[in-house]
Every structure is written in C-alpha cells, then in structure tokens.
Swiss-Prot record:
InterPro entries, sorted: Dim1, Thioredoxin-like_sf
Keyword Nucleus: yes
A single cellular component GO annotation: U5 snRNP
Biased composition (Basic residues): 133-160
Gene behind the chain: txnl4a
Region Disordered, annotated ranges: 132-160
A Pfam family matched in the record: DIM1
Function: Plays a role in pre-mRNA splicing as component of the U5 snRNP and U4/U6-U5 tri-snRNP complexes that are involved in spliceosome assembly, and as component of the precatalytic spliceosome (spliceosome B complex).
Family: Belongs to the DIM1 family.
Main location: nucleus
Alphabetical UniProt keywords: mRNA processing, mRNA splicing, Nucleus, Spliceosome
Organism: Dictyostelium discoideum (Social amoeba)
Domain of life: Eukaryota
Matching Gene3D superfamilies: Glutaredoxin
Name of the featured protein: Thioredoxin-like protein 4A homolog
Amino acid sequence: MGGLLIKQLSTEEDRVVVIRFGHDYNPECMKQDDILASIAEKVKNMAVIYVVDITEVPDLNSMYELYDDCPTMFFYRNKHIMVDLGTGNNNKINWALTNKQDMIDIIETVYKGARKGKGLVNSPRDFSPQYKFLKKKKKKKNKKKQKKKIKKIKKKIKNN
C-alpha cells in the first residue's frame, strides 16, 4: 500500500494531494472524513483527497511521524507541503477540523503556495491554543455586555 500511495503522489501533477492518515473506526478520523467528503466536490480542481489506514503503511508511519489519531498532510508533485497553523507543528494537521470552510481555505492556500514553489505556507487562520483561549475570553465579555444591554432595555420598558 505504501508503494501505491507514493506512486499516486508522484503521478498527480496539477492538484494538491490531501491525505488523512489514521483508522476509519477512530471518532476523530470520522469527523475529519465527514469534513473532507463534504468539501471534495468543491475542491476537486485544486485537490484530490485520500484516506489511508496507518496499519497498511507502516513504512510511512515513522517517515512522517504518524502517531496522532488523525494526521492530515498535503503533497504537491510528490513534495510534502507544510502549513504553519500557529500550533508549532507545521508538518500536518493533527486534529479533526470542525469547520468545512477552514479546510477549504487551507487547501486553497496550500494549492496557491505550492504552485508558486513554496514548501511552507501560512494558514489563513491561526489555530494556536493561545488564540482559541483569547477567542473564548472575548465571547464571555460580549455575553456580559449583551446581558447588561438587555437589562437596560427591560428597565426602560418597565419605566415607560
């Protein structure tokens, strides 16, 4: 299987090859597979998507450090394209994305960068844990502001 996969990587000339490694029975892989299947038609001119069971490609497991539940990697003309997601690991996405548009945007960025000869591209969105924490904190502040506004409106209505 590993040889067949490498052959496929070398024969695809015009599109990015997106490979989700893992196990079909893994819940994280199932989530990622749903996202990938739902966007496959939208990205068909930019990318071809494969899912690969890591037990069938043991030689690639150590080569690409496929130890996470659901690593997704990108290749263009048999060259590994890295993506800076803000996580510190530029080799692969090692979690299941929850947003279809995020995956489409990443594939588009990889496609455009790879066609220009870049081996590393910057993700259009920051996925760093620090960013996620700040985003949650901001949402809490916004909720508090909304509650205050609602209280003021209720008081005005009550007084009138």
